[in-house]
Amino acid sequence: MCAGRCDRLIEFENVSFSYTGQEHGGLHDINLKISDGECVLFCGRSGCGKTTITRLVNGLIPQFYQGELHGRVLVDGQEISNIPMYQIAAKVGSVFQNPRTQFFNVDTDSEIAFGIENEARPPQELIERVEQTADDLRIQKLRNRNIFELSGGEKQKIAFASVYAMNPQIYLLDEPSSNLDMTSIQELREHLRLIKKQGKTVLIAEHRLYYLMELADRIVYLEKGEIKGIYTPEEFRHLSEQERERMGLRAVDLRAVFPPKPHSIAPIPVLELRNVTLRYKKRTILHDIGLSAGKGEVIGVVGHNGAGKTTFSRALCGLHKDCEGQFLWEGKPMEHKARLKRSYMVMQDVNYELFADSVEAECSFGIRNPDQTLANATLEELGLAPYRERHPNTLSGGQKQRVAVAVSMICGKDLLVFDEPTSGLDFDSMTQVAGLIRRLSN
């Protein structure tokens, strides 16, 4: 690798790539140069090739993901396919869309130290670097925690910390805000500001755009594997709302987003919670809560990462048993088995609930007498029809999310619970999911 700073740190020269056995998700004739210290945001609809860009830079293509690659990807003037993986890992740090896939340890401190440890650093340096990382990123409260007991947002923070501890020159972030609450997104923005101030090169594949407008030097818009536009933040802000929606992109200014006026709901409650207390490993998560919900009502449950939203959702569906109080449906008590039969939950990490070998089969998996007409219509409405023969594990994160939502629409349950249903979704998919939820409620 070249000594000192290279003006062009990353280069794509006529790059095309297609995954083995897949028609979608590849790239076509990509030409792009990224300078050292630059922050570049990649945006576009789910499956447009954002994640593929990051896999080409960190060497996972072609060393892990198989397919047909044409053109050259260079880092520091060297073709990435010729650089040993251990050298790439020392220079390029990756935070994946699903942080669970990059964890190697069961506790947070060991995970943060894992990359440095593999570089055979002295033990004292490991300790100092973990402490410095926790201080810089303000995650002291996450130290010495069991990773499996963290919320999705907390896992995302540890994944970023494990990369930060290695001090790479290049950061690759794939949907880094997908599991974060508003406060944590602001913290992420400050972390990105910090590494940019340190002169790091940052590539971000993201659907949430608003928090990056002051950080990105350039914004690259991808469509069906091709670069359709490269903008400065100022140029991007001046896109009309109609242009942005046509491109399938979320808002760049949250002040422009106003929720619709809620419909009046019949006051007769169908679901009731009375004096419910939830515990996890003898620790009280939520205490003495009550809830009354009418038929057709859509209720949003909000709170910070780790506040108990997922535990509450799991309790509603009968998946969390350590609870006290009453759960009633139409005035009749429901124990956890009854709640399991009446409800369906789309989890925050949908990889836990995709079992079939095709999208089409997933839509009838475990469902008695599935309505095939409804299944086909739902796949069409969520833009999944072209992928009906694809294995769910070959889809992008946003596409997997839509598959899980599609199953919830088809299963015929009375109570649907969605845990972060819009994480990883582009604008089109987000509005489609919102429309389906509203239609089901009606």
Predicted regions and their residues:
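Conserved ABC ATPase signature
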Residues: N146-L150, E154, H391-L395, Q399
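Helix-to-loop junction immediately C-terminal to a conserved catalytic motif
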Residues: N58, C317
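H-loop/switch region of ABC-family ATPase nucleotide-binding domains
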Residues: E206-H207
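Catalytic Walker B motif of ABC-type/P-loop ATPase nucleotide-binding domains
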Residues: Y171-D174, L416-D419
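Conserved ABC transporter NBD signature motif
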Residues: Q66-Q78, G325-R339
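The feature captures the beta-strand-to-loop junction immediately N-terminal to the Walker
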Residues: C43-R45, V302-H304
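Conserved ABC ATPase "signature" region
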Residues: Q124-L142, Q372-Y387
